[in-house]
Amino acid sequence: MAHRAVSRSALSRSIAVVLAAAVLGMPAVALADTAKEQELEARVAELEKLVKQLLAEKQAAPSPAPAPAPAPAAVAAAPAKPDAKPIQVATITPNAAPGTSFVFTGYAKVDGMWSDASDGELTESNAARDFYVPGGTPVGGLDEGSPDFDAHAKQTRIILGADTVLEGGDKLQTRFEFDFYGSSLGDQRVTNTYAPVLRHAYVQWRNWLVGQTWSNFQDPAVLVDSVDYIGATDGTVFVRQPQVRYTLGGFSLSVENPETTLTPYHGGTGGNQRITTDDSSLPDLTARYTWKGAWGHFSVAALARELKYQTTGTGAIDDSTWSAAGSLSGKFNLGKSDDIRYMLLAGNLGRYVGLNFVNDAVLDASGNLETIDGVAGYVAWRHVWSPKWRTNLYYAMQDYDNKSSLTGGLVNKSSESFSGNIWYTPLPKLDIGAEFRHAVRELENGDDGTLDRLQLTTKYSF
């Protein structure tokens, strides 16, 4: 570029000199003597020679390469104007939800487990292959001789919500929660695809809650820190259902969706049949009071409900009865690193405990309902070894007073399980766990079966 500029400048000066000489010399041609003419001719010849030389050099010089176009990245990296707003913080729909903050959280969890049943096989469609179901432990079958392995990510959870601050300062809260224990859209052969399942969907304002969530008869604060989906399943209330709940301080009262499960007279077909009636006219009623402190918490709860069955046609049945149950539960802190969690239940527990291990009532020969009562509970110890390591040991049980003359001998009588786990947290929000369980299921006639399971898991919370 510099050489090209010099050549152009020299050429311009040369041409200017030639023209100036020609112009200045023209008026004096007639008067000029021979010497001056010769001098001018010599200068012109010299200038012509110089011009030819410069033109030759210009033609011989290589053409410079065109300047490269600016890279897209450089353009993208150019600083924005001072008044420009970043796209990611600009409101797409201004004032669409004033005073509202949104919630998106949950976790991804993958489980792998070896299950060894003493009296038969857990079939592929059995939910007991995904998590511990006390009523799913085989009884009276033949031992396969080797454990079965299963892996899935069905417990993965998604939680959505919105919190809106109203004009008066009150907060309106909504929550939606899903996991993937729904009906299979695929299978283990190809896609391992499973449908999302609605766990919670409720609206909360001041002291009121309306929607689907944990039953008020349940104390979710004392659930075990388990690798399994539930943990102390034999001895805990585990029910989510639609309800209207009122809470004032430590006291809460609710009306909840009713349902009745019955055992037919002498157990019906197969000796352990279940009838789901959906005939109740009144909601289930619950009440709870909870005391809290630095020491932990203690809670007492009661449940009252109508059990009802109606049929039409020949041998029609129309009967109902009331039943009740009670619960004591709590968590006691033993210093900074340990706590004890427990629950004790008694009365007509039915569908509320052990994933409906026993039914609410049994039909007699005349079609009347007779309630089935029992006791259940668990105790768990949790110890934190360090910020990265923690351990849980727990025992759970349930036992029922069946009227064997009505139920027959093939209905569930009792179950219990012993479990221990260890959790490792190598990174924030990342948990790796292992848990072993030994479980026993017994029928009313005394037959029993056992289940041993080793479960491994990886869980990332977000």
State where each predicted segment sits:
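N-terminal periplasmic/intermembrane-space "pro-region" immediately following the signal or transit peptide
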Residues: 31-123, 141
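Outer membrane beta-barrel
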Residues: 89-130, 134-264, 279-297, 331-335, ...
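Sequence/structural signature of outer-membrane beta-barrel proteins
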Residues: 115, 181-186, 215-219, 224-230, ...
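C-terminal closing repeat unit and adjoining cap/tail of repeat-based domains
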Residues: 418-435
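Outer-membrane beta-barrel "beta-signal"
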Residues: 424, 449-462
